[in-house]
Amino acid sequence: MHQDAMQGSIYEGSRRNTISKPSNNNPPLDMSSLNNDFGQQLDSLATGVGSGSLNGTTNPSSNFNDSNRSNISSSLRSEMEMSNNLLKNTQNDTWTSTVGLSVPENQEAMNFNEGPTGISSIASKNNSSITSKLQNNSNLSVTSSANRGRTSSVSSSYDPSFPWGPRMSSVSSGKQHLSSLSLHTHFNPSSSSTVSSDSLESSQQKAPSSSSTATPASAASEIISNKDPVVEPTHSASNAANSGSNTIRARQTTRTRSNTLPWSPRVFGPTLGYNTPPFGYPPTTSSALPNASGSSSSFFGLPTAVSASAGTSFSDISPAAPKASLENNIASNASSLLNPVGLDHFSAASGWSRDFNHLPASSLATARSSLTGNAKSGIDSSVTGMPSDNYARVVESSTAEFFDPSLASSFGLTNYRTKPLTTGFNHPRPQGHGLNTSLFNTSSGGSLKSPTFEVSNRLGDVDTVPDLPPLGSLSSRPKPSSSSRRRSQSLSAMLKTSNPYMPSPSLLSGSLANSSEHSSSPRLRGSPIHNQPVSSSKSTASLNTNNNGLRASTPEMANISTRSSSESNNTNSWPTVGDATIENLTQHEPTHALWVGNLPSGVSATTVATTFSAYGTVSSIRMLSHKHSAFLNFDSVETAKHVLEELNGKRIFFGSDPVCISFAKVASSSSESSHSAVDGLNKAFSNVSFVPSLREVYDDLINVVQSFGFKDLSKIYQILNAACELTDFAAQIPSISKAFSSRRLNAPKLRQVRKRIDNGLCTQEEVEDIAINWLDEVSDLSSDHLGNTVVQKLFDYCSDPVKEMMLERIAPHLAQIGIHKNGTWAAQKIVDVASTEAQMRLIAKHLQPYIPLLFADQFGNYVVQTCLKFGAPMNDFVFEAILNQFWVIAQSRYGSRAVRACLESPDVTEEQRVLVAAAITVYSVHLAMNGNGTLLLTYLVENMNYPHIPILLTRRFVQDIVRVCTHRLAYNSLLKIISISQGDTACGDLVVDAILDTQNDLNPNSLEKILFEQTYGPSFICKLLTHENISASHRQQLQSAVRNVLGTMEDRGSSELKKLAEVCA
């Protein structure tokens, strides 16, 4: 009876100490006092365990009276509570160890007939034996005593991949000398304390030697003593020095870390070990589960042949189980792997499986063996409950590949990128995902209500935790399948299958992926699994896209219905990918409309239409920028079929993924009218045909150049032919944030270098030494707010060979540096100081694909203008790009002004200037209807003195006289052209003839159309009648025609028509 009371008290005390929150005011540990407490408890407990009979065995102390037994029970309970608190405060100092007591030693320790003295001697023997094994075992996990305390996140010695150990040097082998490390174990606290003090002394001795460096002989050597101008936050100059400083910081702290255990609950049982309640569902007898009987056979990765029922309650546990001693319990429990799932330790990988029951049995040996497979781990899968095929492949400890939904394309291709894994104290623990005390069953002593976690077999690091299910799925009752209605991207939208402990398949963009494929795909931490029930009437279809899985990136994309197997065989239609509306807009029957998907982000309608116009005539285009797709209408069905066969699944844009093309349904008349304004490349005005390409206007350009009075056309032909051959223009310039390193630059060192160079304290040789030592960082420095000034100084003072070395590193990124607010200054300086032909050719090679985009950028256009100083023929690549993409450049805000600046530059030859003037003349009608293009047209008329400019422009304007006269910008340009020819009425008379020409097939009854457009038409006719550069005969003809048209008009209420009637009266 007293024994049962003692057992209940012990259990209640252990449970109370385990579940209660730790106090933050606990004093720091004193290893010497800890050793004394252990010795006293060993003696007292050895005396206490002898009271009563254990399974029929007899103890020497069985003749004690009831009062003695009561005192022993009370003393034992008090000591057990002290031990619980003691080990609980030191739980995070416990590290995984595979060293334990051998079988003979266990048997010797389990002999109770030797009395208290024998027990003490055996304990001493076991402690010394364990200490010797710890010191002789080369596979022991060791950590510096300095880093056991909670360190600051800005500490230079903090390493997320090795949270409680010192930072390992990047050039070392990753191993540290045992003299600077201490062993953390619960076997012998005194030995741990001794090693810790030795470690501190060793680190203090090593610190001066490691930090002492030779004084540089010169100023430059002092500057470049640290060759890298980049600060690595995870690097430390001296591991031992930092270890010693952190030891002081660890001693001063009084904050305990008992609440930093992983999410899986650990119950501190009466055997002074960490027990885990049964997780099995249904209950199993596998030794992979914790043995509730108190035996050491099933504690955390120590597999034996002994198993116990998972349903054993804690009330049946005796204070000391048969054949179990305190030392053995400590060896098998307290020093075992406390956190097989999420506790930070030095192992670079962790074994994962889809079976949740294996988690408590994941020992250090299992984690280490996952690198080489289960066959080499030395652990029997039948004992641990971990099947060999459930091991996930591991990745490096510093980075992991994960799914980024922000990079997912509109039609469902999964994108991956790498991200440094953060771990340690600042890592978000699973408590943030909603796991709290409500998840524990109060009647089972801290066990979870149901193990319905869907632990996917995925990539993970040592601190990766499985995704938690919604709170509603933690019931032991099986859940029915959810309805097919799509819900928001929340945890409650997860599919609850009838089997609560088996992962369910998910619908991935119209194709079924089995559970193994799904579980192997990496996902963001805490991201929900968007599963969808699949109807059996739908057949599965798979699409091979270079081993990239298909995943619905948005809920609406998952609604794309799958097609039949016969339809899925058509690879040209890409049936299983697309945006939210592609299912309703695409079809298999050939049409003159095409849907183009997987377009690069930021691509313009101009670029898309120009690219596809090379394969056929494009009549219109409609962009869906938010869906990364577009709809193109061609002139015929045959053209659309030809484009689909030629370009489907190919990379047609520089640096982008293959495009997806399929036939689209022809839009209705209502949708056509709503998009009539978006017609071709010109988005500034409606009903305008596509601007012709350079090849189409090649002969026209030559004729205009000849009209300007040029006879020698050899150089003209050379530039035009080279411009026609250009086809590799980029669709976009990569963002500097993707190429720029995330490392923090050393601002003080950069300021020091710049100041010394500005003050003349460094010779040219010293400056070149700095440049050579910083070659690997010069590209990143060019875009930094301080680094770009240093790069400019380096290019100013270095010789040509050194500048070429730096330029080889910078030139591939020169375009993206040039459009950066800081990098544009460095890019302009690099281009400006280029003096050799090799440097100029290298710059031209890497800038030419980006010339149109640089012209349209507020910073990049200055980089292009700086290239003009190269002189001909080195700067011909700029004018070749202008001629090839003239309309794209001229219609942009910065491009039109940059072209005008190029025409004014003294570094431009006459051949280059006349070619640009001829291009302005040929594209004059399109430029007149664009606000930015009007600037170039005005510059040509007012500032360029080539002959016959007014008459050449007028002849082109009268070809589309109605649109020119009714456009708010174009008609002003036409009046300016007429006014430029002083005393010459040829241009004005030509315009009047075009308006009155009834034989014009393109614009019959032009005057009526102009007057009926009452916004700008009547105003233009009124100004034309009062213009002085029109002959009298043509003026009278126009007045007579206007009176006749006004007589037929019923509505003449506008002010412009009234004014026009007064002029013609």
UniProtKB/Swiss-Prot annotation:
Residues 1-78, 130-265, 422-573 are annotated as: Disordered. It holds the Pfam family RRM_1. One of its GO terms (biological process) is stress granule assembly. Transmembrane segments: none annotated. The keyword Repeat applies. GO terms for cellular component: cytoplasm; cytoplasmic stress granule; cytosol; P-body. PROSITE patterns: PUM (PS50302), PUM_HD (PS50303), RRM (PS50102). InterPro entries: ARM-like, ARM-type_fold, Nucleotide-bd_a/b_plait_sf, PUM-HD, Pumilio_domain_protein, Pumilio_RNA-bd_rpt, RBD_domain_sf, RRM_dom. The modification Phosphothreonine is found at residues 260, 554. SUPFAM superfamilies: ARM repeat, RNA-binding domain, RBD. Pumilio repeats lie at residues 771-808, 809-844, 846-884, 886-917, 919-954, 956-993. It comes from the Eukaryota. This is Pumilio domain-containing protein P35G2.14. It comes from Schizosaccharomyces pombe (strain 972 / ATCC 24843).
